[in-house]
Amino acid sequence: AYKNRVLDSVYIGGGTPTTLEPAQLDRLLAALRANFDFGTVQEFTVEAGRADSITKEKLDVLKKHGVGRISINPQTMNGETLKLIGRQATPEQVREAFAMARAVGGFHINMDIILGLPNEGEADVTHTIEEIAAMKPDSLTVHSLAIKRASQLSKWIEENGMETLKNTDRTMEIAAQGAEKLGMHPYYLYRQKNMSGNFENVGYATEGKEGLYNILIMEEKQTIVACGAGSITKMVYPDGRIERCEDVKDVALYIEKIDEMIARKRGFLKYGE
């Protein structure tokens, strides 16, 4: 329904697209370019996410297809915490993946961290910020911990208690000061469900490196066409009214009902024209 429509931004993420093999990534990105006009695209982002999923071959594929922004998300640069929350990548792998992306070149690199992780206090956050400052990303997203019910972290908290979560005004301040030292300014913030404490997620960026998609999705002033299990297509009408069309979250069920999902979304998009 939206083939050859004008696009402002393309964002592939929400999970970790770089878990795909290089050939699969190549096929996905080639299909996008074959079916949509990229002539007006101002921003093309792929979440590289976990450092252990990043290889030079995958980065070369992203660059070949014109991806200009990637996100490498350590969450913390403390190895023990990474093990505790079920992250396979080590701090060293994060540094290696970042250096590899810089060597390939052509990418704006964002990094995500999470404040309020179990047993992490001010010293741990300071260490993470210092490690990130040494790498010099173009932007930084500071998340306050949101606890997902089915996660390894959720089970750990059930056993050890919420008092292990130590996000405070001071840890938020440490992150903000670190971003400022990198020449970044805050440009968007949002809250989400199940967050620990009365905090928010804040995006920081150096001048001119702000994420267009992040701004558009927060302001809810532009239609977003989403594809994939758990994705939500959002239609913004001229009168400001917003309607949503959700795909089922379960991957197996999504595959089983793919024809139904496509037909439903086609009808939704056609109705919104």
Report the location of each language-model feature:
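A short acidic (Asp/Glu
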Residues: 121-122, 199, 237
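A C-terminal junction/extension of Radical SAM enzymes
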Residues: 150-227
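Alpha-helical structural motif
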Residues: 28, 171, 192, 247-254
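Radical SAM enzyme core and accessory elements
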Residues: 203-273
